[in-house]
Amino acid sequence: MTCIFIKNINEINKMRLVGKLVADVLDMIKEYIVPGITTEELNNICHNYITYKQHAKPACLGYQGFPKSICTSINDIVCHGIPNKNSILKNGDIINIDVAILKDKYYSDASKMFFVGKPTELGKKLCYVAKKSLYLALYTIRPGINLQKLGKVIQNYVKKQNFSIVKEYCGHGIGRSFHEPPQILHHNYYKSNTTILQSGMTFTVEPMINSGSCEVQCTNDGWTVKTKDKSLSAQYEHTILVNEEGCEILTLQKGEQISRILKNLT
């Protein structure tokens, strides 16, 4: 039987702290995302901010051999893009920056999309749908519901928008370990999940949405995942705490207003 860790108040407070650090990095990096900058430069800015300003550790660096401190996934890259000096942002790109931090023995993890210059209409719509699919799932969370319901909510919304959901990657429990049980599926194709949400659970929700086919492939570097048909992909991610009222978003960023996005639930 899978052991899901329920956090006590001391653990929750530590996760609130590290969650805020993650949110602060995503707020900080926005001004640097301009045409002409390399993803290597973005990585170095985040690494230095986490290490020297926040006095924390970039959790991605060295994790199962990952060589950088953040993931940078541009356009048709679904996830786990490796920052490098030859990857130069250009006008119209969409980029996901994924930040995970370890502080005082606890982890937090979040990602968001950024526009480089002026985005295409497809890029704008895809990012909006990816963000809203995450928010709809977060709005659904409360103690006593089956975890499977989150995937169903995401799937129903994304399908109506004529986009597709990546099935190979999922959210995860998080706390003293970077990845803990349970797995958080962003679809409802596997209907055997019996996990019931409880107050004190902490996990990530991180749907990856493609503008074309849901099929993906891993490149030769062993990390970078791309859409098979070269269509655009977008992802938003938060670390959350299940509480008696629903959930607390531990990685909420400045000015982020979920209610505004959820006004139109179609």
From Swiss-Prot:
This is Methionine aminopeptidase. It comes from the Bacteria. Its cofactor is Co(2+); Zn(2+); Mn(2+); Fe(2+). Its EC number is 3.4.11.18. One of its GO terms (biological process) is proteolysis. CDD domains: MetAP1 (cd01086). Binds 2 divalent metal cations per subunit. Has a high-affinity and a low affinity metal-binding site. The true nature of the physiological cofactor is under debate. The enzyme is active with cobalt, zinc, manganese or divalent iron ions. Most likely, methionine aminopeptidases function as mononuclear Fe(2+)-metalloproteases under physiological conditions, and the catalytically relevant metal-binding site has been assigned to the histidine-containing high-affinity site. Removes the N-terminal methionine from nascent proteins. The N-terminal methionine is often cleaved when the second residue in the primary sequence is small and uncharged (Met-Ala-, Cys, Gly, Pro, Ser, Thr, or Val). Requires deformylation of the N(alpha)-formylated initiator methionine before it can be hydrolyzed. Transmembrane segments: none annotated. A divalent metal cation 2 binds at residues 109, 172, 206, 237. Keywords: Aminopeptidase, Hydrolase, Metal-binding, Protease. It catalyses: Release of N-terminal amino acids, preferentially methionine, from peptides and arylamides. The gene is map. Monomer. Substrate binds at residues 80, 179. Belongs to the peptidase M24A family. Methionine aminopeptidase type 1 subfamily. It comes from Buchnera aphidicola subsp. Baizongia pistaciae (strain Bp). The keyword Chloroplast does not apply. It is an enzyme of class 3 (hydrolase). SUPFAM superfamilies: Creatinase/aminopeptidase. One of its GO terms (cellular component) is cytosol. A divalent metal cation 1 binds at residues 98, 109, 237. GO terms for molecular function: initiator methionyl aminopeptidase activity; metal ion binding; metalloaminopeptidase activity.
